[in-house]
Amino acid sequence: MKFEDLFKKKTAPVTDTADVTGETPDECPNSDTDTKQKEKSLDQVAPKSIGVLDMVIAFDTTGSMAAYIGAVRQEVSELIPRLFEDNEDLRLGIVAFGDYCDMKNPQEFGKAYQCIMPTDNQDELVKFVKRSKDTSGGDSDEFYELVIKKIVEETPWREDANRVILLISDATPHPVGYTFKKYVVNNQIDWREEARKAAQMKIKIDTVTITDEPWYKELSQMTDGMSVPFESGAKTARLVEAATWSRGSKADRLKFDRLMEECSDKEMQEVFTAYMSERMKCDDDDC
């Protein structure tokens, strides 16, 4: 795809495969019976094949949002192995992004869009997070519309995978028609159109409600993703664990349940509850 084509309105139909360009509960389980009952329940909700997970975590690195990926950098060497230890079918991608003003020039993103495609190469993921650069952002909006478009269209999603984007951000997308110097002129990327493409490709987009901007909940609703109450940058690694394990292998989901039962942090309780609600919905719908 040519660079300038990213900002043009696309009318081609979307297919299922993207082109590749580049407080604690009252009682915790303490017996074999509890464990067997939980495993039986998970067999209904999480058959072995559902552990196939392609997940892209997209970090806004502008201004104060840099603290979120910064918190992950501090423990990434331990975090990444934990995410993979019980799921050989996990592929994880990471995007660190800024805004148009952070681009190297009108034809090169530079540090404005840094990414590693979904992979199970843990060393490369750790290296990417440690080497990713923070950005400044030039106005109240950020180029979320472009980030969504690029991740949806350029990620080599596996056909049988559960496809998820976790967007960790706090601002709003640029509107259609936005211009910034020569970097983008009369931008034709509409985030709602990109969300519809994601939904057609069965890509869920999870968002975090760091602010009360309504577009986050709308984005998640449009793509059948989760809008998760979350504010504290220092807990970002815990958020990533919850988002990954809630849709991972049976072992991952048991780990998620155990952490939820043991959790006493109010904010993380809300995160766990949000992801558990998806599990319950899936159970009710027999999906």
Give the label of every model feature segment.
Residues 2-287:
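Divalent cation-coordinating acidic motifs and surrounding scaffolds
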